[in-house]
A protein has these predicted regions:
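Extended basic (Lys/Arg/His-rich) segments that typically form rRNA-contacting surfaces
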Residues: 1-149
Length: 149
């Protein structure tokens, strides 16, 4: 992707090459120079509790059973209501469907934060952070790791 001139100037001033992802954080380390590389061992240590944010895996258009955990209807005795959501509201009195009613739709592919994950190990040679638990997003995606307060 081509960066615009203000962003290129911002990176040039910091002495950093154009990168795929540019994020801004509060500096967790004192006395860090502009454009300096922040290593994982400077910020995290084993046993620390962190929260990890990222874009969850998109699952496309899903029904209410998969998306919201609705129960399905009976499969036998002539029922044709196996995977349908059921009633979506009252009749003539409200004369409408209330906002926010859980229905079928696009599932996943949104920002999710997994909280309370424990740092198992920090590998300084590879700049790796090992965390116990699930991390949002597909393999190879970018995540944001922050200290839990």
């Amino acid at each position: 992707k081509v960066l615009n001139k203000p962003r290129l100037g911002h990176l040039r001033k910091a002495g950093v090459p154009p990168l795929r992802l540019l994020r801004e954080f509060r500096c967790p380390v004192e006395g860090l120079e502009v454009g300096a590389e922040l290593r994982v061992e400077q910020v995290f240590e084993p046993g620390q509790v962190v929260k990890v944010s990222g874009t969850s895996i998109g699952k496309g258009f899903q029904g209410t059973i998969k998306r919201h955990g609705f129960q399905r209807g009976p499969e036998t005795h002539g029922s044709r209501n196996i995977r349908k959501p059921g009633s979506i509201g009252a009749a003539a009195d409200p004369s409408r469907v209330f906002k926010g009613l859980r229905m079928a739709g696009r599932t996943g592919g949104r920002r999710v934060t997994q909280r309370g994950l424990r740092v198992v190990n920090v590998i300084p040679e590879d700049n790796l952070l090992l965390v116990r638990g699930s991390v949002p997003g597909p393999r190879g995606s970018y995540v944001e790791v922050r200290r839990e307060r």
